[in-house]
């Protein structure tokens, strides 16, 4: 009996029509096809090649599967098993560390999600046996800048992976992959007999130095030796050395940036609480060596959101525009950005207090910001507005939302796609201006730019319901190919947000990074003596989301902001149906928690009753006052 031709279903949950694998758009509702390729942490031999498991996962190899029903929630267990807790707690390291997608039906294999993987315009895998190309196969032919950048990304991951006892992953080249300009780990390898040290990392790098680019071979070899012999005891020293080497290598390239941004109130809102910087003439977009883009989504009251988003942008732009970035170290720039975000926060918070705004009347704003200088891109975010990094082969979401769903994941309580089904999953746990800056924890990152790419900054008016994942190839990628200009792309994304979402204001900013070679500047050998001084620099730093700043290592108050709870929007009915979305599940830990509270309450009542009968002295029966530290923060 011939095997039926595999089909892929529409990702729109109100449609789910069956389409051919070659289809770019759904034949019923015209939603762009999403092809989500997944990796299984265990090899599964299908009944026959090209067959599907549980009529859903198309087997392309024993460990590579295509989800043919992307709108359907994956299978997840009632309780989170120990073997995936590290993935969940390393959620802030995405996209370097893959997300757990769910269980492969009727197996004990876990499916891992990388966002996008290299594929052709028709959706065919470019690396059908590897899914994502191996670092080891690309290393020897890579440019000096690329090699240093890959080592730099590994160094940033060392501390968080060590904290979860999975640092062995960085010593196994088979698990290290390169997806666009991002180093991704295929899966995590758990430390077994001993926990790897920097000496082990140094031995590995020293071995790789044999095939390093001739201009940096000395640097990589000596850096490996210093790690191997214990002369470097802090991974931040290695990061500082790599920073200096990269700064030398980038001199052969010229960097320029163009930004176009637009905001729109949307079809169903009379006012616009979003704000954006910069606003420029679409006919005259400047090319800059340094650039700044800011997107804010205001929350709180009819007029409060507009005030908060506008004042935040005005304050940040006025401060950042005065920075001499080329004279500052990465650590100082990150420190300045943190200081300025906290400053903007306190301005809004103090205005809330002076105007006696309470609960839902308090105003605040989400924030995403991209600051570029030469080969460096600094990113900051607070709230659930997002930043995506687009290259010719990839679209990576490089921010994680500050909401309850993400918090459940990084605490190890839930798988992300499962947590999205929880009530109030989109409730913010922080926003600029809602609380004093002592309770604010801005997320900051830094990336190196190897080649042409685009950063998309947007509010949830666009990012909701996977619109970016659906449309980036058709609307943003043509800009990189020279087939579309920035204003056209931004206008298209605004139109998509209004037509396919339409429930909120929408703001979009595109930052186009262009890298060209400077033919008049030859490649020069970077020696160890050129970078060794970085070992003694006192201002060592690390991106705060890749330096162990998880909930178990920082005293972060991430209780939900009552006044910023975002109602779960109803999916637009594109094809005219009136089906309801599946009911959102309660957290799996909620029932045991309620039971424990009931038991403890009963026990407390019994204890009080017994004490009253034992000692009738009324002065001795007064319960102690509750300590301030034991109470929840009231809004």
Walk through the language-model features, giving the residues of each.
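Long, charge-rich alpha-helical interaction segments
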Residues: 208-209
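Long, low-complexity intrinsically disordered regions enriched in Ser/Thr/Pro/Gly
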Residues: 24-25, 30, 38-39, 50-51
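N-terminal sensory and localization modules of signal-transduction and trafficking proteins
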Residues: 15-17, 34-36, 40-48
């Amino acid at each position: 009996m011939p095997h039926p031709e595999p089909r892929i279903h529409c990702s729109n949950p109100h449609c789910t029509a069956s389409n051919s694998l070659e289809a770019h758009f759904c034949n019923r509702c015209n939603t762009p096809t999403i092809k989500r390729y997944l990796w299984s942490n265990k090899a599964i031999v299908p009944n026959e090649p090209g067959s599907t498991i549980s009529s859903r996962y198309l087997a392309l190899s024993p460990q590579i599967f295509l989800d043919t029903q992307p709108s359907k929630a994956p299978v997840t267990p009632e309780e989170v098993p120990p073997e995936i807790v590290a993935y969940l707690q390393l959620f802030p390291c995405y996209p370097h560390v893959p997300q757990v997608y769910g269980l492969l039906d009727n197996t004990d294999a876990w499916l891992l999600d990388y966002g996008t993987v290299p594929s052709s315009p028709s959706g065919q895998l470019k690396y059908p046996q590897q899914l994502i190309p191996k670092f080891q196969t690309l290393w020897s032919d890579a440019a000096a800048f690329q090699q240093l950048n890959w080592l730099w990304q590994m160094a940033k991951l060392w501390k968080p992976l060590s904290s979860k006892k999975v640092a062995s992953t960085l010593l196994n080249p088979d698990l290290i992959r390169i997806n666009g300009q991002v180093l991704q780990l295929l899966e995590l390898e758990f430390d077994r007999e001993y926990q790897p040290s920097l000496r082990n990392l140094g031995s590995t790098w020293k071995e790789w130095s044999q095939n390093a680019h001739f201009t940096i071979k000395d640097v990589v070899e000596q850096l490996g030796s210093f790690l191997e012999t214990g002369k470097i005891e802090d991974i931040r020293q290695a990061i500082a050395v790599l920073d200096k080497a990269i700064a030398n290598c980038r001199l052969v390239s010229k960097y320029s940036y163009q930004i176009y941004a637009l905001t729109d109130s949307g079809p169903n809102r009379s006012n616009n609480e979003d704000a954006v910087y910069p606003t420029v003439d679409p006919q005259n977009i400047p090319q800059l060596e340094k650039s700044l883009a800011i997107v804010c989504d205001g929350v709180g009251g009819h007029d409060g959101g507009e005030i908060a988003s506008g004042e935040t942008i005005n304050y940040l732009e006025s401060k950042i525009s005065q920075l001499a970035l080329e004279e500052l170290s990465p650590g100082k720039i990150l420190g300045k950005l943190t200081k300025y975000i906290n400053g903007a926060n306190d301005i809004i918070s103090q205005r809330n207090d002076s105007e006696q705004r309470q609960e839902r009347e308090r105003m605040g704003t989400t924030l995403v910001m991209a600051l570029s200088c030469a080969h460096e891109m600094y990113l900051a975010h607070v709230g659930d507005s997002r930043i995506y990094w687009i290259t010719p082969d990839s679209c990576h979401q490089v921010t994680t939302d500050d909401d309850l769903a993400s918090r459940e994941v990084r605490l190890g309580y839930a798988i992300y796609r499962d947590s999205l089904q929880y009530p109030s999953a989109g409730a913010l746990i922080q926003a600029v201006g809602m609380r004093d800056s002592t309770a604010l924890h801005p997320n900051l990152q830094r990336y190196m730019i190897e080649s042409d790419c685009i950063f998309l900054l947007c509010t949830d008016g666009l990012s909701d319901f996977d619109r970016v994942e659906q449309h980036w190839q058709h609307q943003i990628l043509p800009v990189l190919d020279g087939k579309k200009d920035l204003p056209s792309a931004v206008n298209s994304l605004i139109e998509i947000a209004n037509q396919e979402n339409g429930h909120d204001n929408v703001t979009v900013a595109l930052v186009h990074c262009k890298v060209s070679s400077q033919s008049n500047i030859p490649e020069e050998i970077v020696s160890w003596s050129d970078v060794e001084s970085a070992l003694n620099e006192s201002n060592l730093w690390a991106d705060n989301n890749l330096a162990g700043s998880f909930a178990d290592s920082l005293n972060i108050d991430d209780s939900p902001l009552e006044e910023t709870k975002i109602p779960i929007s109803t999916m637009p009915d594109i094809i005219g149906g009136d089906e309801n979305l599946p009911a959102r599940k309660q957290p799996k830990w909620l029932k045991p928690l309620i039971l424990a509270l009931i038991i403890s309450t009963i026990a407390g009542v019994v204890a009080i009753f017994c004490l009253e009968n034992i000692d009738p002295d009324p002065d001795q029966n007064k319960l102690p006052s509750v300590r301030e530290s034991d109470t929840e923060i009231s809004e």
